[in-house]
Amino acid sequence: MFNPVTPQARPYAEHCCPRPLHGASAGTPGLQGLDFPVCHQPNLASSHHGYGLVPGTEHPGGAADGSRFSTPRGAGKLGKKRALSISPLSDSSVDLQTVIRTSPNSLVAFINSRCASAGGSYGHLSISTISPSLGYQNPPGQQKGQGQLFSHTPPLPPCSSHETLSSRPGLLHPTPARGTIKHCQQLKLERSLSSPLTAKYPEEKSEGDISSPASTGTQDPLLGMLSVRDDLEKEDGKPESETIYETNCYWDGCAKEFDTQEQLVHHINNEHIHGEKKEFVCHWAACSREQRPFKAQYMLVVHMRRHTGEKPHKCTFEGCNKAYSRLENLKTHLRSHTGEKPYVCEHEGCNKAFSNASDRAKHQNRTHSNEKPYICKIPGCTKRYTDPSSLRKHVKTVHGPDAHVTKKHRGSVVPGHALPASAAPQDMKQEKNTNGPAEIRKDDGKLLVPDLVSKPQPSPGGQSSCSSDRSPLGSTTNNDSGVEMTGNTGGSYEDLVHAGGCGARGSHGHLGADGLQKLENLRIDKLKQMRKPSTKGLNLPAIPEPVCRRCVRVCV
């Protein structure tokens, strides 16, 4: 099936193992023209030596003439070519076991040699690439030990071999030493903490590189296999809302209990949501929306999942148990499996891409801008953030989970705005009862009349008491001025006209606050009598609004 070893490849084969028996398979013809890099020779030699290569079979001499392989050198030459080794050994004493333990790339080369096919992978030198006869299959004890070494990677299929260990009993030892495995585990942990490659990789993943390592042919395949897993672990680390599994209905006026969550959801959708066709309001007990209506029915259906804990949108990938209440959240999660990153940074010259828009916004605000437009509006807090999610997290953790709700729906009156009509009379009456008449005198002639609470009366000496203010005829509550009135004030219409005339030509010294108060009481009482329907069938003409008080007096 295979041709004998060619003269070009024979020195390398003699270096790696004893001369093969007659009929043994050798290297493929396609490898005769390959030139392997020198940096992988120590790794390959160390991997052979660590698995029981007989030291006596090594040839310290050079390669044969015409060989195109970069064959291993002697002790002196090997020390010069060992560019990637960090071993402090001298040229005269080279220990391959030390090379295995101290070489920064020995573990990576071993992984590549296991997962490489017969045609080679990514330009790395593997055992099965050089000669299929040298390919070997690890016994179960070795596979288990190697799985412990590289437990962070998914299980890899074993490489195909053309020759079992039983055909070469003196070539490989059955199992490696346990001390070597433990030492390699320690090296792996130290390298993960100190190696720039390992430290740089999570940073690049968090920034969202547009090209995943799995699709790039120049990167290590081990990193490509870890890329998708890192995305999943990154998503798993995100804080999620508490898992709710509700089976009782707390709708207003309903206290039914069910066995499963599905029955509760079916009950709410059919009896509570679809039963109300005109308004879409959540009547769940202690709901933070405080019965504010939704614009559409489907919004109420999605909102109710916050109370019931329903998550109908489940991940379809095998082995993933993620589920979401909103469809857009599921779509974002699926991108962690597929590697899709449709949101590209809008900054010129930046090729970063992200799986969701919020991560892109965070990147643009943090990397390309120093602006922090999202400000905490809690009184006394001056925190500013680049993205809304960080602001929400700050409000929830520092000011409490209900801080944004209480601030958004608080019922305090904004300064500068008038009080509602229903609350104005009581507040004004209380102020009158507590402060007394002296409080009215402090206002320098300012009266609180209906619909004119915030407008002071003009000075009696400089202007007539009649003004172009809106007439109180359209108001049904005529006692909102804050002054207690009786049914009969004891005055007549002639007194009203006389008082009005006096008010026009009198001075502040003659009338004072009591005179102005009496004038307003008489005017309001007379206007109330005018609004009553006449028993004699007299129909008064309708007065358009707004109308001047002078016109009211003249027309009557």
Swiss-Prot record:
Alphabetical list of InterPro entries matching this protein: GLI-like, Znf-C2H2_ZIC1-5/GLI1-3-like, Znf_C2H2_sf, Znf_C2H2_type
PROSITE patterns: ZINC_FINGER_C2H2_1, ZINC_FINGER_C2H2_2
A GO molecular function held by the record: sequence-specific DNA binding
Residue intervals of every C2H2-type zinc finger in the record: 247-272, 280-307, 313-337, 343-368, 374-399
Residue span of region Disordered: 57-83, 133-178, 200-222, 387-492
Superkingdom of the source species: Eukaryota
Keywords in alphabetical order: Activator, Cytoplasm, Developmental protein, Differentiation, DNA-binding, Metal-binding, Nucleus, Proto-oncogene, Repeat, Transcription, Transcription regulation, Zinc, Zinc-finger
UniProt-annotated location(s): Cytoplasm; Nucleus
Gene3D superfamilies given in the database record: Classic Zinc Finger
Region (Interaction with DNA): 295-303, 357-362, 387-393
GO biological process: cell differentiation; positive regulation of DNA-templated transcription; positive regulation of gene expression; positive regulation of transcription by RNA polymerase II; regulation of transcription by RNA polymerase II; smoothened signaling pathway
GO cellular component labels: cytoplasm; nucleus
Biased composition (Low complexity): 135-148, 454-472
Function noted in UniProt: Acts as a transcriptional activator. Binds to the DNA consensus sequence 5'-GACCACCCA-3'. May regulate the transcription of specific genes during normal development. May play a role in craniofacial development and digital development, as well as development of the central nervous system and gastrointestinal tract. Mediates SHH signaling. Plays a role in cell proliferation and differentiation via its role in SHH signaling.
Homology family: Belongs to the GLI C2H2-type zinc-finger protein family.
Name used for this protein in its record: Zinc finger protein GLI1
Taxonomy of the source species: Eukaryota, Metazoa, Chordata, Craniata, Vertebrata
